[in-house]
Regions:
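Catalytic cores of nucleic-acid endonucleases
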Residues: 51, 58-107
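Short, flexible loop/turn elements at secondary-structure junctions
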Residues: 29-31, 43-45, 58-60
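Non-catalytic C-terminal interaction segments of nucleic acid-processing enzymes
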Residues: 4, 8-19, 97-171
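Short, well-structured alpha-helical interface segments that form or flank functional binding sites
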Residues: 5, 36-39, 73-76, 80
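Active-site beta-strand-loop-beta-strand hairpin of nuclease catalytic cores
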Residues: 34-53
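A short acidic/basic microdomain associated with nuclease active sites
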Residues: 16-34
């Protein structure tokens, strides 16, 4: 299973706690909001502005390397931290993920010729009781970053599809 598959499962599966139709979800957040590390997924409640970080791991080695990082996934705006990945890593998550982090596993299943992903919270995340909800200006910036990310990706896919033809951008 790839990181993209896990990300898809976490955001597109209606059984996921981070379904994109009910949360603000932006991938790979690093710059623009003052984080000291990159967040694989930043999930924010549109009502309470409470933030959750999701760290995606697809191998035991990747999970072990995370232990060497200095930031330890802490930010005062993050209420909960989850580690997410394939169900086959559940044992490694329990062994190597920080004890305050929740664990979400993903199982792909082929149904009628198409793959569906099922997310399961295997351990609830502990709540950072000193967290501070995001401010409206930060939400605005996050949505701006998500918008920029979408249109950058759209442009790359468009160029790939059209082999660079009809490129009107000269910047």
């Amino acid at each position: 299973m790839t990181a993209d598959e896990v990300q898809y499962a976490l955001t597109y599966s209606q059984n996921s706690p981070f379904y994109f139709r009910s949360h603000y979800v932006v991938p790979n957040v690093h710059y623009g909001l003052g984080f000291n590390h990159e967040l694989d997924l930043l999930v924010i409640s549109p009502v309470t502005f409470i933030g959750t970080e999701v760290e995606i791991k697809v191998s035991k080695g990747d999970l072990k390397r995370d232990l060497e990082k200095k930031h330890h996934h802490f930010d005062f705006r993050i209420r909960q931290l989850y580690f997410a990945g394939p169900r086959t890593l559940e044992g490694a998550f329990h062994e190597y993920a920080p004890k305050e982090a929740g664990i979400i596993t993903v199982i792909p299943q082929v149904v009628c010729g198409s793959t569906r992903y099922y997310c399961s919270i295997r351990r609830n995340a502990k709540v950072n009781k000193s967290f501070i909800p995001f401010k409206p200006k930060e939400i605005e910036q996050l949505l701006r970053l998500g918008n920029m990310r979408y249109w950058s990706l759209f442009g790359k896919q468009f160029k790939r599809k059209n082999n660079g033809k009809n490129d009107q951008t000269n910047s």
